[in-house]
Curated annotation (Swiss-Prot):
PROSITE patterns: GLUTR (PS00747). Residues 432-454 are annotated as: Disordered. One of its GO terms (biological process) is protoporphyrinogen IX biosynthetic process from glutamate. It comes from Shouchella clausii (strain KSM-K16). NADP(+) binds at G189, A190, G191, K192, M193, S194. This is Glutamyl-tRNA reductase.
Amino acid sequence: MHTIAIGLNYKTAPVEIREKLVFSEHQLPEALKKLRSSKSMMECVILSTCNRTELYVVADQLHTGRYFAKAFLAEWFSVDMEDVTPYLVIRENDHAIEHLFRVACGLDSMVIGETQILGQVKQAFLLAQEEKVTGTVFNQLFKQAVTLGKRVHSSTEISSQAVSVSYAGVELGKKIFGTFSGKHVLILGAGKMSELTAKHLYANGAASISVMNRTKENAVELASQFAGTARSFAELNDALKEADVVISSTGARDFVVTKENAADALKKRKGRPLFAIDIAVPRDIDPEIATISDVYLYDIDDLQNIVETNKKERKKEAEKIGVMIEAEIDDFKAWLNTLGVVPLITALREKALQIQGDTMESIERKLPHLSERDIKVLNKHTKSIVNQLLRDPLTRVKELAAEPDAKHSLELFKTIFALEAQIELAEKAEADHAEQSWKEGQRPSLNQGMALRT
């Protein structure tokens, strides 16, 4: 049994390649079933976003699993495997597990620490569960990944610092006002940066948003996104009297807000602070207004410096999270090892019960006078002896399975109890059953492939 992660993302493939390999939401159920029915596949999850398309699979063989995962992508999207292979990254076992944990924690995202990907990982897993294409391994692995992602965001500062210019302005405003609840926002210009900043302010509780733009239609369109109002530049002084926050990005060649009209507006504000964000180049707001009492002015360089500082802080937090991920990988591997010991336990029980059964047959032949009741009593007590003798070894072998050197210890356990023959027969039976299942178009048991491999 092997865990494989195969796919591409914004780091490995340009957008013109990524856009050809995106699963639409309505396609995913069918895609999951088709991937699961591919040879070697035992479990699967598909994670498809604007920045990544990744297949996570549990396969009974590494080589076969890799090949048929790539073949599935090529066939599904009608592309040549040779064309897409250079952009694919394939991770196996520990590396695949680590990658999933990093993705869920936001460490593999374009913006380190972003939280949206955690929800996308969770939804991908839940859909795979609904389509019944996950099993023992992925039910545990993805639950751990989602739980780890939540813990990372709640116990570290990875997602608390602004790493975009638009959101950095919001964070600065919170330091001045505490909250944007009840605050009035004035937007000068209807460009993308103004729109993004306005969205953040609106999401943080701004009471009203007014938009001024040279082109009235653009002002109306942007204002409508926030149930706001479009105003003309002729009303600028009045708007400055009312606004608590000013965002400016007009593209004008001269100052739109001068020290004079700002000073005039401030006289009528009765000491209310004015927070101004100038994200235009060249600047829209006369930097001299920062000398006026109760005016807080920040330009694009101020915001960019904050963003760069915050990015460095996020990288420091990412190092802490790396340690958390390593511990989580160890926990998952310990759990996974306990699955590998199941065939060993089964073989030992079967061997012991076979000995007990043979002994009972011998007793019945040699003591034919025993009553049916006597035989039942003897059978019960000899089975009890077997169970008591096995209790400690079976408890210990489960503990051994969770230790780092489990492979050597379990091999020794198998040798001591001479279980090689039983396990070989069990593995052959499983392999024969799996092959027959593929021929008949059936799914093999999710427990297949979990036999101890040495």
